[in-house]
Design a protein with these regions (language model features):
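Phosphate-handling active-site elements
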Residues: 57-61, 244-257
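Charged C-terminal helix
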Residues: 79, 253-294
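Short, Lys/Arg-enriched N-terminal segments with co-localized hydrophobic residues
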Residues: 18-27
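Short pre-catalytic strand/loop immediately N-terminal to key active-site residues, enriched for Gly-Thr
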Residues: 36-41, 220-231
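Conserved phosphate/ATP/ADP-binding segment of small-molecule kinases
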Residues: 141-217, 252
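Conserved N-terminal subdomain of the carbohydrate kinase-like
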Residues: 29-34, 48-130, 134-137, 283-290
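Cationic, low-complexity basic patches in intrinsically disordered or flexible, solvent-exposed regions
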Residues: 9
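Short, small-residue alpha-helix embedded
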Residues: 47, 227-251
Length: 294
């Protein structure tokens, strides 16, 4: 009996040692949070954010704001309650010291207000990247003017916004952007209006992305993939920037690395159902390890 009790004690001590070791490891890894929606089809949203975080060597955490579901021949966004979003954020704040935050689809004005309060509490604590999801390629719908105006209140609280050309057009109240020249114009117009660092992406039509911070404009050129597996590219781009910034890469390094990462994810994309989703096999995650690049 004494031997049995001794064995039990040894097992308990081993479990405690493993638990303590795991807790210590969790404290050491970089922790990045995505605040956004769930894409039931798996191509965008928090699903792609978490895959990107893992591929680029950060530990992903989530605050869910909404769920995309099929509705007839289209899709619908089902928002979570404001209280549930608040409770998730409180859980994160209580238990984790974050190294970066990526914000995606917020779904309602009320949820935007909750996220504004969160960003005010943590402005300057860690990089905050905002992908302002204002237009959906699948339906060409535009979100309400009230939502767009509320999002503009969020912009000064983040470190970078990553609109695609269509979202930049909506934010700047501009004409449709179909050429690089028009993209340059809308980027300058938007930067003059909202005074925040931004990288405007070509959105599958233009291979060049444009950075502007009010003082400087910089072009990030690259090849244009002919693959149709680009669903989730915008989500992956912003979460990749978040991961790289969390690893202390400079902003321009982070943008450049993330652009290359997303191109590979499109090239390696997969067809799932009727969707062509970005995909980045986990075996390629070494492209985000800082020590191998410097």
């Amino acid at each position: 009996m004494d031997g049995f009790k001794t064995s039990q004690l040894a097992v308990l001590l081993l479990k405690e040692a493993l638990y303590t070791s795991q807790k210590g490891l969790l404290k050491m890894v970089l922790k990045t949070l995505t605040i956004g929606g769930s894409d039931t089809w798996g191509g965008g949203g928090i699903q792609t954010d978490l895959r990107t975080f893992e591929n680029l060597n950060t530990f992903g955490l989530t605050v869910l704001t909404c769920i995309a579901v099929e509705e007839g021949d289209n899709f619908a966004i089902r928002a979570l309650s404001v209280e549930l979003v608040k409770e998730q954020l409180q859980t994160i704040e209580k238990n984790f010291q974050l190294d970066g935050v990526k914000i995606g689809l917020l779904a309602t004005v009320e949820i935007v207000e909750v996220v504004i309060d969160f960003c005010r509490r943590h402005q300057g604590d860690f990089p905050i990247i905002l992908d302002p999801v204002l237009a959906f390629k699948e339906t060409q719908e535009q979100l309400a003017a009230e939502y767009i105006e509320k999002m503009k209140t969020l912009f000064p609280l983040v470190d970078l916004i990553t609109p695609n050309r269509n979202e930049a057009q909506l934010l700047a109240n501009s004409e449709p952007v179909e050429t690089l020249e028009a993209m340059v114009d809308v980027t300058k117009k938007l930067a003059d209006q909202i005074k925040v660092k931004m990288i405007v992406t070509g959105g599958g039509l233009i291979a060049t992305d444009l950075y502007r911070d009010g003082m400087e404009t910089r072009a990030f050129a690259g090849p244009l993939s002919e693959k149709k597996t680009n669903h989730g590219a915008g989500c992956s781009f912003s979460s990749a920037i978040c991961s790289h910034l969390a690893q202390d890469f400079s902003l321009f390094e982070s943008i450049d690395k993330s652009k290359k990462y997303v191109f590979e994810a499109i090239e390696n994309g997969v067809i799932v159902g009727d969707a062509g989703n970005v995909w980045h096999p986990i075996t390629q995650k070494s492209c985000g390890i800082k020590s191998s690049d410097k």
